[in-house]
Amino acid sequence: MLNDEVPDNDDYDAGRRRGEFDNITPEDFTRDHGSGRATPPGWLDGESLGRIRRQMPIAYVEIVPVRADEFGRVTQIGSLLRVCDDGSIVERTLIAGRVLYHETIREAIARNISKDLGDIALPQLPQGLMPFTVAEFFPTPGVSPYHDARQHAIALCYMVPIAGDCKPQDETLDVEWVDPRTAALDSFLEQMADGHDYIVRQALAWAGL
């Protein structure tokens, strides 16, 4: 798995078979290159992942979280506030993450939402898996509207209604919501970099807003 995650016994997909990764537990962790980051045997260490990112595209899912009314109409658009990797500033972004080895698209959507919004967010996963757009992130600025300095990533983009309570997890500092019909939306989108604002605009157009 690309994000060094070992499923806990009570995880929603803990019982799913993963072939060579079955029966790996947190006790199987090994230390890698003295970095202090734990990597299970046979999984990609940071150096290997970095090399692969420089050589081939990486599959991602990107989720635009929304609140919807009883008729399914979008009433709010959500975003995450996170500290940048270098710790310098807080950035506004969307839910995104790699599709792991031997993981379905549907499972990747559910796992990444749970990772960022918590276990009681209660996402209403789409019945079909046709994304509203496919965003190609390139490490070279200007190749497309989407930029990721680390890698060439191909992101399947989905709008997912969130019915439960959101409790920020991991690097997420807060989850903020905005009514897409108000003037606050423009300010909201201006704070998104690297093409994530364009993804939100496409999501709104897809939803008829």
Region locations from a protein language model:
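Active-site segment of metal-dependent pyrophosphate-handling enzymes
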Residues: 118-166
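Conserved Nudix-box catalytic region and its N-terminal flanking loop in Nudix hydrolases
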Residues: 72-120
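Nudix hydrolase/Nudix homology domain
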Residues: 2-13, 86-92, 151, 157-209
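Hydrophobic (often cysteine-bearing) scaffold residues that line and stabilize catalytic clefts
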Residues: 57, 101, 105, 196
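Residue-level signal for short segments within beta-strands and strand-turn junctions
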Residues: 65-67, 81, 161-162
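A structural signal for short, well-ordered beta-strand segments
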Residues: 63, 109, 158-160
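Acidic, metal-coordinating catalytic segment for phosphate/diphosphate chemistry
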Residues: 3-4, 8-71, 147-148
